[in-house]
Amino acid sequence: MSSKLIRPYLVRLAGVKIGKRVHIGANVTFDTIEPRLIQIGNDVTITMNCVLLMHYLKTHENGVIEWHRGKLTIGNNVFIGANTVITKPIMIGDNVIIAAGSVVTKDIPSNCLVGGYPRKSLDFLKLKRASKTFV
C-alpha cells in the first residue's frame, strides 16, 4: 500500500473524519488530544510539515491560563501549503488556498487565497467551478 493511501487511512483510524481524494503529505501533525473534532472535506491537499491543532491556551492579566478546544473543519477543494500551522479551532471554507508557511488563527471564508503570519486574505478566488484536481 502506498504512503498516499496509508496516511489518510491511519489518520481515519485515529478518529479524524476525512472525505474523498484527500492527500496528506509527509510529516503532517494532527492534534492527538481529540482527533474526532477534526473534519476534512473532499479533494483536500495538506502538504508536508503542516501542523493542525484544535486547542489553544489563553492567558489573562491575573495570571490565569485557560485551556480551550473546539472543532477544526476544513471544507472541500482546499490546498494547504507546506509548513502551515493552524493553531485554533476554526472553519476553513471551500475552494481555499493557504500559502506555504502561513499561521492560521481565524476562520477563512470560501473562495479565498490567504497567506502570512498571521494569515491575511490575499484575494478572493474567482472560481466558476471547482476542478477535480486542485494541484
Residue locations for each model-derived region?
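Terminal amphipathic alpha-helical/low-complexity segments used for targeting or macromolecular assembly
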Residues: M1-G15, R21, D43, Y56, ...
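Generic signature of intrinsically disordered, low-complexity segments enriched in small/polar residues
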Residues: I33, I80-A82, K120, L127
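Left-handed beta-helix
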Residues: A14, K20, G25-A26, D31, ...
